């Protein structure tokens, strides 16, 4: 089947998705860069012309009303994800929703239940979940090359306090939902067991959102993950998985570039490149295409239950830090 993709929103992340969809079409995949919707028609038209999309709409309602749209990618700030994803679902559209999936777990539960009721595909666009590097890392853990795995660490930080969505509580700002979600997902992909204990700390920005945070997860099997995210500094973005015979380094947990294996003497014994990609977003699109072709209502790479589990964890972290968004009061 040809899958006609529509993008709801015309910001930077929408451009990244547009490039991926266009790249898929150029390499012969049955995917069409079909339509874009923005709050202003002129902006949508400029985006469509620049990115090679066939149609432009000056409202989100018009976009989701187009009967030829097969998949809507929600690319607005995460404070608006619930509203915009639900709008698309109400109009019978399958949805790929950018992370963080929603503002909180309550919204996530409502949205996934609504999609299931409507019989539509809904999945969270947390891109490392869909990348081939995910299975490569899991296969290495299972192979025993680093022995018995006991712990991991992961971090992600960028100096982006100048970006309004990061510091504005009305936009669900803070490092956790925008950046911290990646180390958390890295840990939960590597260690799928139930989390037994959580400890954490955060430093707040002047607007009372979290500027940087440190999270330690202890899993029921005794493994541990130590995680850090920040919107104040550039970090090395490194993921390290530790075993009793060595360790695995993942260069850039946000978009893995290379995987290295080290022995107990800290000597690199193997370097594994990740497959070439358009920009990494294409794997989400292909997963949605496969799901639609097979009649699935969620993607196995990020099932609804896992999205809700991550949102519940982030809710509990914010609660422990005393961070409540204005819309939640």
Residue ranges and their predicted role:
Residues 1-51:
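N-terminal Rossmann-like dinucleotide-binding module
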Residues 31-35, 70-72, 174, 247:
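Short active-site oxyanion
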Residues 71-73, 220, 287-329:
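C-terminal helix-rich "cap/oligomerization" subdomain common to oxidoreductases
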